Amino acid sequence: MAKPYRIVNQTATTPPKAKSEPFWKFRNLAEGDEKAELLLYGDIAERSWWDDTATPKRFADDLAALGDVKEITVYINSGGGDVFAAQAIGNMLERNSATVIAHIDGLCASAATIVACHADKVVAAADASYMVHPPSMGVCDYLTAEDMRNCLKALDTIRGNIVALYAKKTGKSEDECGTWMDETNWWTAAQAKENGFVDEVDDEESDTVVENRNGMLFVNSIGMGLPFDKAPDFVKSRMGAKTPGGFSNATNNPGQTGTQEEEAMEIINKDDL
């Protein structure tokens, strides 16, 4: 009997949002401007992606409701999330007739990089961070040897799909992109540009705020699901370096309350805690 599983690519798992809240937010700009924005802050596709309020179809409907816009800017500040959801979002945006610009405001890590790589252009704030790392597997059930072999096959397939996307975006070989992923790499915006993941670095004054809240990494008041000590030094060194106009802090990440439901098996991409 096949085992149910969920594949995610993120720094760590977080509790799901309330069912009434999708994890994305669209908005049209001024009437006649023919531009729209998509906000992807926090985890991409938590478990709420699969309930009746936040589904791939709802995302497609929200995207279609924008109408005939010429440009969509996707603002990203995310530690990752569900691989299949990130692929669905990325492919829907890529198929859209509008020019899609991904703008990395703070952190673009793990599955969030999948969405960014589907954009026509990737712009990063000068003090933004980019991170790639390999998927890992968390098993929460009794599995036979055949079950485990099937899990490994699925994991290898997902890794291969992501590596191929990276190679397409960067123009690098799949071997080089695979090595980057397997080693786990954190890059500054400039380094991500040098490696081909970012097309342009925005040198204007940035609002990025890095915080250590009870030992966890927060970027622009959004929890990244990663222990602060796991972040590289160039990220930790930005703590408290808030510029005018930065985001205000909140006690908790909105919507991140509740109990994480149990899954029989997960394939995840996270740092060892």
Model-predicted segments: where are they?
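N-terminal organellar transit peptides
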Residues: 1-111, 119-273
